[in-house]
Amino acid sequence: MSDELQSRTCTPCRGDVPPMTKAEAKRQLAQTPAWTLSDDGRCIERSFTFDDFKDAMSFVAKLGELAETEGHHPDICFGWGWARVTWQTKKINGLHDNDFIMAAKTDGLAPT
């Protein structure tokens, strides 16, 4: 469940672990169903909508603070009323448990 993932803390990825297989990533997506797996299975992405630019910017700022705290950082694009977040562990050029932990934590920041 996403609550279990939200309660976890990211562990530093040293880069000496293999990325998740596409099948493993699909299983993890069951815990973060709002996220989409890329065609190559190397990242997950979700788009968010907001009432205006200020709300989108506030979400991005909160996500930035969370990323700094956890030591794991997303790619973020945003504009008036929207944001798109992509998680991938760059050291392994693919997905790691940390990406799903952070996806769940990102969901916790999203407007309801």
UniProtKB/Swiss-Prot annotation:
Spans annotated as Disordered: 1-30
Reactions catalysed: (4aS,6R)-4a-hydroxy-L-erythro-5,6,7,8-tetrahydrobiopterin = (6R)-L-erythro-6,7-dihydrobiopterin + H2O
Top-level EC class: lyase
Keywords, in A-Z order: Lyase
Enzyme Commission numbers on file: 4.2.1.96
Molecular function (Gene Ontology), one example: 4-alpha-hydroxytetrahydrobiopterin dehydratase activity
One Pfam short name: Pterin_4a
CDD domains for this protein: PCD_DCoH_subfamily_a
UniProt xrefs under InterPro entries: PCD_sf, Pterin-4-alpha-carb_dehyd, Pterin_deHydtase
Gene Ontology annotations of biological process type: tetrahydrobiopterin biosynthetic process
PANTHER family: PTERIN-4-ALPHA-CARBINOLAMINE DEHYDRATASE-RELATED (PTHR42805:SF1)
UniProt similarity note: Belongs to the pterin-4-alpha-carbinolamine dehydratase family.
Protein name listed in UniProt: Putative pterin-4-alpha-carbinolamine dehydratase
Natural source organism: Aromatoleum aromaticum (strain DSM 19018 / LMG 30748 / EbN1) (Azoarcus sp. (strain EbN1))
Lineage: Bacteria, Pseudomonadati, Pseudomonadota, Betaproteobacteria, Rhodocyclales
